[in-house]
A protein has these predicted regions:
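Beta1-alpha1 glycine-rich phosphate/pyrophosphate-binding loop at the start
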Residues: 1-73
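FAD-binding core/adjacent interface of flavoenzyme oxidoreductases
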Residues: 1-6, 63-125
Length: 125
């Protein structure tokens, strides 16, 4: 698989980046890789859902249809194991390899062993 824009991180920052890129580039291919099983949900609303005060669908901030309508590929439940910024490759725990032209990282604070000096950060917009 190869994408013009590869976004690692499916939280609000990653999703907003994908939507913003799409608004400026209607033809480039965009993919979001997230280790979360479900895309963009509100952690704030989870207690209300658990207490059955709101329906499950209210917890999700975007549907898969929202991404499909914008031609954004979502890879949920996929953990990134390695990034090769020179060859522009990302290796997933599932064994898949993704090639990219531009890479955006939206990582949480639990990135153990990440050597930032080896990464190439690209400002997209």
């Amino acid at each position: 698989m190869q994408y013009t824009y590869l976004i690692i991180g499916g939280g609000i920052a990653g999703v907003t980046a994908a939507e913003t890129i799409r608004a400026h580039d209607s033809h480039g291919s965009i993919a979001i890789v997230s280790d979360e099983a479900h895309m963009l949900y509100s952690r704030v609303l989870l207690p209300s859902y658990i207490k059955k005060r709101i329906p499950r669908e209210k917890v999700f901030l975007r549907s898969i249809g929202d991404f499909e309508a914008k031609n954004i590929v979502v890879m949920s439940g996929e953990r990134v194991m390695k990034i090769d910024s020179v060859r522009k490759e990302v290796f997933l725990a599932s064994g898949r390899t993704i090639f990219f032209e531009k890479l955006c990282l939206f990582l949480n604070l639990l990135c153990y062993g990440l050597n930032l000096s080896l990464l190439l950060f690209i400002v997209l917009l």
